[in-house]
Design a protein with these regions (language model features):
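PAPS-dependent sulfotransferase catalytic core
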Residues: 225-340
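PAPS-dependent sulfotransferase catalytic domain
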Residues: 152, 166, 303-306, 311-334, ...
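Register position in tetratricopeptide repeats
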Residues: 15, 49, 83, 117-118, ...
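Conserved alpha-helical positions within TPR/SEL1-like repeat arrays
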Residues: 11, 38-49, 72-83, 105-117, ...
Length: 463
């Protein structure tokens, strides 16, 4: 079998997710063809699929040593840096790939995703629109453009491009889920009828059927057929849970470790003045009202709503891994705190924030409140809480874009909520004056009073 046929066979196995087989065959083929840039790039892509980031980067770089103008390898290396939150290096590489080939659609798409991460949505939209002029029937470009418009509240454009996605690829169900957010369904709605057919379509894989189940749950709820709504919510959650690897004990043990780390820390005696930067962290359980609080505060002329930033979590978890045996060293060594603080500031400095006060709305930052106090003593922390049953049910009936894996099984969701509640109580005992707690229901029922109190806590003038 010649190399072309071997690669074709390998790509077929890659497409069905048989990555162990692909790695074995690619290593063998690459050994026989050590100067083949394409093989090194494909090997790197396969390592990415099995989450071996280091090996992926090595092979992408080897591919580029063999062929510095291999735009696919440049693009893949840029994606790896982007996923590792090294946005500066990722941007440099995307620009390099597009310099070699200005019409490289994958590069335009991935660079647009980086721009969205950096809250530069207008530039992301420009990149996607350019890509669509090159490949007008590329359904992923239309879907990505719809998501970009969604992030800036242009819902008419979102729906238009989601519908175009399905026109090109009727089986791409994430577009169904996106459309469902903007329709108040009736039983004769054509999209509703389409989804009822699609759920029994054997050509649609389980990952896509998850999206249809959640969309149908919302549709049946709109129509008022609650038994069917619950059925599809249950099916969607069960199917999603079967497709992910997750152990609730990992999260619970992490929260226990955090409490142990901070148990004997007296913040009144420890002067962690590492950074004088002012910023706002809005946190709590997902679906507790954090988005509403962010919308209110980011409408202020001096506040920049940065969305859910991954930076703090990644920086702290990296230090956890490096200090597994003596986690308290993270706190007790000033140099560690300075490195972590600088890393966060460096990441947020890339955002297009016009020198405004940055608001980080990652709900799960409740895990890191003690770290925030140590790293940024002038920060403002707002904890949003909501009725536990309402919070958990809202989590359960929503499909999340990010990895909130505890939300797809009722028992795991309850265990996570209890651990969250315990940790928040711990932080309130330790750092009561540092945390402003607000109830979602109070904000809804008495907005004027609560908005004024929020602004006062953040030291912002009423506008």
């Amino acid at each position: 079998m010649n190399i072309k046929d071997q690669i074709k066979q390998i790509l077929n196995r890659f497409s069905i997710g048989d990555y162990d087989y692909v790695l074995i065959k690619l290593k063998q083929l690459s050994k026989k063809n050590p100067y083949n840039s394409y093989l090194k790039n494909l090997l790197g892509s396969t390592y990415l699929k099995v989450n071996d980031i280091e090996s992926a980067m090595i092979n992408f770089k080897l591919s580029l040593q063999l062929d510095p103008k291999n735009v696919a390898a440049i693009n893949n290396l840029a994606n790896t840096y982007k996923n590792s939150n090294n946005y500066q290096e990722a941007e440099r590489l995307y620009l390099k790939a597009l310099e070699f080939n200005p019409n490289y659609v994958s590069g335009l798409l991935n660079y647009s995703n980086l721009k969205i991460n950096l809250n530069n949505v207008d530039e992301a939209i420009d990149l996607l629109q350019k890509a669509i002029t090159i490949e007008p029937d590329n359904y992923m470009l239309h879907f990505s453009l719809g998501v970009a418009y969604q992030s800036i509240g242009k819902f008419k454009e979102t729906k238009k491009h989601a519908e175009k996605t399905l026109e090109i690829n009727p089986l791409f169900s994430p577009a169904d889920k996106l459309i469902s957010s903007y329709i108040k369904y009736t039983d004769d709605n054509q999209h509703f009828i389409k989804m009822k057919k699609d759920i029994n379509n054997q050509a649609i894989n389980d990952n896509n059927k998850v999206h249809i189940h959640f969309a149908l749950g919302k549709a049946f709820e709109d129509i008022g057929i609650n038994d069917e709504a619950i059925y599809h919510i249950e099916k969607g959650n069960n199917l999603k849970r079967s497709l992910i690897k997750y152990d609730i004990n990992d999260d619970i043990n992490l929260m226990k470790r955090i409490k142990l780390m901070f148990r004997d820390v007296d913040f009144r005696k420890n002067n962690f003045v590492i950074n004088n930067e002012k910023m706002i962290f809005v946190l709590g359980m997902p679906r507790s009202g954090t988005s509403l609080v962010e919308q209110i505060l980011s409408s202020h002329s001096n506040v920049f709503g940065a969305g859910e930033l991954p930076f703090l979590r990644n920086i702290i978890l990296n230090n956890f891994k490096e200090n597994q045996n003596q986690p308290k060293d993270i706190l007790h060594t000033v140099s560690n705190l300075e490195i972590m603080s600088k890393a966060y500031i460096d990441k947020t400095s890339l955002l297009e924030n016009n020198n405004k006060l940055i608001l980080d709305k990652s709900p799960l930052n409740f895990l890191w409140i003690g770290f925030i106090k140590a790293l940024f003593p002038n920060a403002k922390i707002i904890h949003v809480n909501r009725d536990p049953k309402d919070t958990c049910f809202s989590c359960y009936k929503n499909l999340f874009a990010n990895s909130l894996n505890f939300t797809y099984q009722k028992k795991e969701l309850a265990l996570f909520y209890n651990a969250y509640s315990d940790l928040i109580n711990f932080w309130n005992e330790k750092l009561h004056s540092f945390i402003y707690s607000i109830k979602y229901e109070d904000l809804i029922n008495n907005p004027n009073k609560n908005i004024k109190n929020l602004l006062k806590f953040c030291e912002l003038d009423f506008e």
